[in-house]
Regions:
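Oxyanion-hole/transition-state-stabilizing segment in secreted/luminal serine hydrolases
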Residues: 195, 212-248, 253, 268-274
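N-terminal secretory targeting modules
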Residues: 6-170, 340, 347-353
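Glycine- and acidic-residue-enriched helix-capping/strand-helix junction motifs
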Residues: 83-86, 181-189, 282-285
Length: 353
């Protein structure tokens, strides 16, 4: 009996089958793109850095149902995949697999290819042996490794089909490296990914590390998006002068194109780095003060514009940071919890399906 139980738990890979991820339910995209694993076709006005970030798959997901006991992926990188750095390898070039249990998304497995060179297929197992029967699955893609092609690997002869949309509505989240996910240990641990799983609403990652500065071309692009709401992490990157100059034109551009669509701005977070660095503390405080001043004016002037000031990624123990500026995965959980109630209260006023 012991031997039989051991054999039942071993990896089941023998013969395999490969399903193009594009034939399943692909979600998390705000814009249609020429290349499927990019978030937006690069805009002419973008800097070279922003054009590179536009090609990242952060926030993209694949939903599918399968009765396979083993599940993996086969990926071809579009460019040399990063080793990790601030992200860690699972967040940078890995994949997070979730499955539904008792109506909630639960982590099921993850992994990342050791190989980083582009142009060759690399295969990894995410879960070698899971429960019998049909599983509702959600696969989160790498945050910063550019993907050329992706296939879901399952047992040969198993059934795999597109899954239902995992979350309702379409809510664009434009922001900084915090929104992109810098410092997260896994690709499913950005604050907006956690907010989606916690609420059932579809918060879509449009983070541009270091480059969320209320640029007019981002406003023009977002104004064309087919969305039910916007959330903006808009004050983590720009200087107070940029906020004062750019905020109202940014709002006006989107409001003109999307009247009646809620625009929710959230305050930036405090950084642990400020604890022993007075100059850095003054820098962050000046940003927050200008953001608060301007947003109080904007919420009075424009309908359906909201200001959420409860954002926090600081733990009671001050142990939720990856580098003094960016939260770690736990810090992003705290961020999500800090804004969940006010954001959902605002969204409850609107019909989001």
């Amino acid at each position: 009996m012991t031997c039989l139980l051991l054999l039942a738990s071993l990896p089941l890979w023998g013969q395999k089958q490969y399903t193009d991820a594009q034939d399943l339910t692909f979600c998390g995209k705000i814009f249609n793109t020429t290349r499927p694993y990019e978030r937006i076709d690069p805009l002419e006005e973008m800097t070279d850095g922003e054009k590179g970030q536009a090609k990242l798959p952060c926030g993209l997901m694949v939903a599918f149902n399968t009765d396979s006991r083993a599940i993996g992926v086969r990926v071809v990188w579009a460019a040399t995949a990063p080793n990790g750095g601030l992200y860690g390898p699972i967040a940078a070039r890995g994949f997070d697999l979730y499955m539904k249990k008792d109506g909630k998304w639960r982590w099921a497995g993850n992994g990342y290819p050791k190989q980083t060179a582009p142009g060759e297929p690399y295969e990894i197992t995410l879960i070698p042996s899971t429960i019998d029967g049909e599983k509702e699955c959600l696969l989160y893609l790498s945050l910063i490794a550019k993907i050329e092609s992706l296939e879901i690997v399952t047992d040969k002869g198993s059934r795999i089909e597109p899954g239902p949309a995992p979350f309702k509505g379409r809510i664009a989240v434009f922001g900084s490296s915090f929104t992109q996910g810098s410092g997260a240990g896994r690709c499913a641990m950005t604050w907006e990914a956690q907010l989606s799983r916690a609420t059932g609403y579809n918060f879509m990652n449009f983070g541009f590390s270091g480059n969320s500065k209320l640029q007019s071309y981002f406003a023009e692009a977002l104004a064309t998006a087919d969305v039910d709401a916007y959330v903006f992490d808009a004050f983590s990157n720009p200087s107070p002068e940029q906020v004062e100059e750019r905020l109202e034109p940014f709002i006006r551009t989107i409001r003109k194109a999307k009247p009646g669509i809620p625009m929710i701005f959230i305050q930036t977070i405090d950084r642990e780095k400020s604890s022993f660095n007075p100059a850095h503390l003054a820098k962050i405080q000046s940003r927050k003060q200008m953001a608060d001043k301007m947003m109080r004016e904007m919420t009075k002037k424009y309908k359906d514009v909201y200001w959420v000031t409860t954002t926090s990624a600081t733990s009671e123990e001050h142990e939720a940071t990856s580098d003094g500026s960016h939260p770690d995965s736990y810090g992003y959980l705290l961020w999500m919890k800090s804004i969940k109630k006010p954001v959902m209260k605002i969204l409850s006023r609107y019909e989001i399906r």
